[in-house]
Amino acid sequence: MKQFIEFIPLIVFFAVYKFYDIYTATGALVVVTGLQLIYSWVRYRKVEKMQLFTFLLVGFFGGLTVFFHDDAFIKWKVTVINILFALGLLISRYGFGKNLIKQMLAKELQAPDAIWDRVNLAWVGFFTVCGLLNLYVAFNLPQEMWVNFKVFGLLGMTLVFTLLSGVYLYRHLPAEQKGELKK
């Protein structure tokens, strides 16, 4: 259920865009992302840092989009978030010695540090490519294609990359842990 709730702002953005326009959809995105934050606080008594970070960026770029009536701001948000994710993974690993991907998954999966570092760098590359690809689509193709890319393209790419990361990690798990996962 919690994972579904994460997609609600994206679904609302897409639906409102199809019936109205980018500015109404952006306003709806800001409101629903804020409501999502409130729901998390009421339901779970905590707000994830990533949720708060996303809300702040959505609020900032969405607010600028609506205020200036310029869709360039909301288009840039996708790239900024992806580049910040990539930088966050890089800086946490090589600046502070913490591999965030490993921290998120190490409770369930044990793999050598070198493997975690490769997965971390792969995600850095993935987020960077997504950010750059978004720039290309946002500013070289029609707005409707960008909305479809943002909603379906990036989501699909992320799901595929997550699966590929899982397959890569699975190949490097100790034999006894592979047996546990098959049960």
From Swiss-Prot:
Compartment annotation: Cell inner membrane
Disulfide bonds: none
Protein's UniProt keywords contain Acetylation: no
Membrane topology summary: Multi-pass membrane protein
Record-linked InterPro entries: YciB
Membrane-spanning segments: 22-44, 54-74, 76-96, 119-139, 149-169
Entry keywords, A to Z: Cell inner membrane, Cell membrane, Membrane, Transmembrane, Transmembrane helix
Broad class of the protein's primary localization: membrane
Gene Ontology cellular-component annotations: plasma membrane
Cited function: Plays a role in cell envelope biogenesis, maintenance of cell envelope integrity and membrane homeostasis.
PANTHER family, sorted: INNER MEMBRANE-SPANNING PROTEIN YCIB (PTHR36917:SF1), INTRACELLULAR SEPTATION PROTEIN A-RELATED (PTHR36917)
NCBIfam families in the record: ispZ, PRK00259.1-2, PRK00259.1-3
Family statement: Belongs to the YciB family.
HAMAP family in alphabetical order: YciB (MF_00189)
Protein name: Inner membrane-spanning protein YciB
Chain's gene name: yciB
